[in-house]
Amino acid sequence: VRPMPTISETNYDQFDFCEDVHKLMCRRVKKTLTTKGLFYRTKEMEDKYPNIEFISKVKEELSEVKHRIMLYDLCYLYSMDKGDNIEMRSMLKAMYSDHMDAAHEQKALRLGDHPLLDHKLVTIEGDEKLKVDDRMLQLLYGDAAEAFLTIVKKLDRYSFVAEINKAFYNPRDFSMRGNPFAKMHEA
């Protein structure tokens, strides 16, 4: 059996970095790493890879390591097709051993007073889900981000009406669904 080849540091990129931060969070969950240890090791890794543009841009955006860790983990989960609606509570429980620290962070997110929201890196779906925003995708993917960004189609007046019709009309039973103008339609 031959040993696995080592990956050269020149191939190490933002995706590898985010995966490594995620692994640290998994260790925190298993209680083999403290929250302070998670923060310290993440800073140490950031300092080890100053040449990765993604890391330096994230550090410019977010001054506190706890917010950067959240972003790195969201990036990892998104890039691994785990979805872009991540449960806020699960992520915070993975980061913090102290429930009150997690509760304060959750409160800030829910009240809209959080750096990830201020910098338009995430949005909140419902009360509990963190959704990756286009700005975060641009940080993570750089020039290739267009493949993942929400595309806003330019519609002429006819295609606009067709899109509205698709959103509200149910062709199966010829009824209107969720239409705020349904009462006007019946009249």
Give, region by region, the residue ranges found by the protein language model.
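Intrinsically disordered, low-complexity N-terminal extensions of AAA+/P-loop NTPases
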Residues: 1-187
